[in-house]
């Protein structure tokens, strides 16, 4: 009897160990390193810097309520996206009796189902918002230039959002919440959503990177020299696809977890697509877990690393992410991970 109990306990421990390893592998991939960074398109760094400077200087400040500066930003974004050959439209909506605008650029594909890339253009208060989030918008505009003349399989929508920052964060007045609801109401299929949220701040200093939970430092680097891909359970395959393309350009880490309060997993526009059970990931330099200038007057264009920012955007190869998404069923992981736990539970109780 004791032998059977010991064998059961030993087997359960072994299964738990293997399961833990599978879960860790499922949730995270350590930073990719060792290979030299691949080259990016000449001139990309300068284009990114030009866009950041315009948004953070000419349009400063651009929070909700600063209508003239937000209008400048909207016009600049729309003009740049129009030059890419996309069909550009404004998506106005009302919050607190004021009108706000999302700027949408659609590249029609053979399939009506959409791959969406979004970035918010507003700032928190009177901060310059170079990293948060002129960097993300600059990446969005660069992607528009890369897609010029391309005939995609899936319809691609690039969209610049209003109202990501307070006082509208977490409300239905976020531009991305309005957009997600519009897609739902119009029954437009969404294959994936990629959110560009702060992609320009990097550090090679030791202990320059922090994390939302104790123990995460054992899995992730202590230097802020990587880009992160953040997703929930439904977005594992999407996150892996994005990481696969990006890791030849710079170190990347991936985190896929349930939406746990306090983990800061949903601190941008992708949250509103998760709320609709759509696969979405955030590409980020990890915000205040690395950048000391977050929501501060020091969030200036000169603090950004445009070389590594260009590697995030990666010239032509960010377009490859969109192409590779055509080959995947993005709900595969959700179904199979549920099956994994079902099989584990049945095996445990059967053996015990």
Placement of each model-derived feature along the sequence:
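A non-catalytic alpha/beta surface segment that caps or lines the substrate-entry region
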Residues: 53-110, 254-256
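Acidic/histidine-rich catalytic neighborhood of metal-dependent amide-processing enzymes
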Residues: 124-237, 265
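Active-site-adjacent substrate-binding region
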Residues: 192, 204-327
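Second-shell loop/turn segments in exported
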Residues: 35-42, 58-68, 91-94, 123-133, ...
